Amino acid sequence: MADDGEADRDLARLVVLCVGRLEETGDPWEPCRLLDAGGSVVVPVSEFLAELQAQDSSVSTLRSYGNDLLLWWRWLAAAGVAWDKVTPAEGRDFARWMQVADKPARPHWRDRVGSPPGVSRGPVTAGPAAVTVNPVTGKASPGRKFSASSRAHAETVLRRFYDFRLESGRGPIMNPFPLDRSRRRGRAHAHRNPLEPFAHERTGRYRPRQPRRIPRRIPDEQFDQIFAGLKSHRDRALLAFWVSTGARAEELLDSVQDDVRPGDQLIAVTRKGSRAVQELPASPDAFVWLRLYQEEIWRKGAPRGRRHPLWFTLRRPFRPLAYPAARAMFTRAQQLLGTNWSIHDLRHTGAWRMARDPEMSLTDVQWVLGHAHLSTTQLYTTPDQNEVIASALAHHERRARRGPASSPPPPAAGYNPDSLGVLFGRPS
């Protein structure tokens, strides 16, 4: 509960401006740093990111945590509260704001060029007014509201940040994002039966409940149409590798030229979580498209060598292909079809194809996908939404062909069917 003496905060009128920014330095000692509205480094966040780096967190994790802390700093600036003066009342209001308010509109990158540090100028861009479902794919598009997964991630990040500050003795005397009240009775899973699986227990008090999502695959006919619309051998090779290996997008984009072994049909990737190098089998056509792409780009003067990146931009100067550029390529390829599949859906598609192969065991699929638990791989054995819809429509069609059910004949001559219906409760 919030303190009785706290000042009322009108969240409906709270305007969160896009002040401050998260800067990627390229320095391995400090990959990311948070800058406030005046362009100064936020030291408490830098210390927290250094702690995460010491815990062997990847650069993408530091970037993800930094973005949530940037949103929190912007919200505190709008609320007029210092980061070390917050209470659970601010944590509660922040959770309510993320649940109800629209996302802060971000200015276009062209309008940010030449602006002072931490200050945005020019018009702002906002997403669609409401979540819409794509009529072709059935996937919901992002709206102006924060998703439940984004809110849950922000709650986890901020709770860990203030736990770190409490351990160092520099910060508020209590965490503004406390644990759920049920956790006060003892540790989690204290009385669990060892013969039963772990049950999900609520962690944070302001952590939202997330719906269980079933992975969505791209139907074969839509994948073929997207593949036919690609403009370059590089893009064809990328899609062929993504869908045949089941690798994550950035795992494949981080590969170097020495990671490819065409003779064995293997390509090495660095796993997202464990950072372990794993060789993955790929389809033969993926290596054909890769060779065509390499010969084409090498003739244009792209770097060639064992330790050079495998994927480059198609125009000079040749730079390593980054995830935003690959995502833009995949989005452009779907414009004519009107679909909104993501690159990660290619991983789901490859996993679904392997899991549905009767001659491939589920443990083999788990190894290829790099899942820590077999239960995660089992998600791909659930019926696909398109298959369930087709099966239900076929059921209705069969019932329509059979026509209305004929009334049973009377048990013997002389019985009135209406009287039998009244006696036995059947409709007349």
Regions found by a protein language model. Name each.
Residues 46-61, 70-195, 225:
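N-terminal core-binding DNA-recognition domain of tyrosine recombinases/integrases
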Residues 3-6, 395-428:
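C-terminal secondary-structure termini that scaffold catalytic or DNA-interacting sites
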Residues 92, 171-225, 270-273, 313-318:
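Flexible interdomain linker/hinge and immediately adjacent N-terminus
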Residues 245, 250, 254-288:
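Conserved tyrosine-mediated DNA breakage-rejoining catalytic core shared by Y-recombinases
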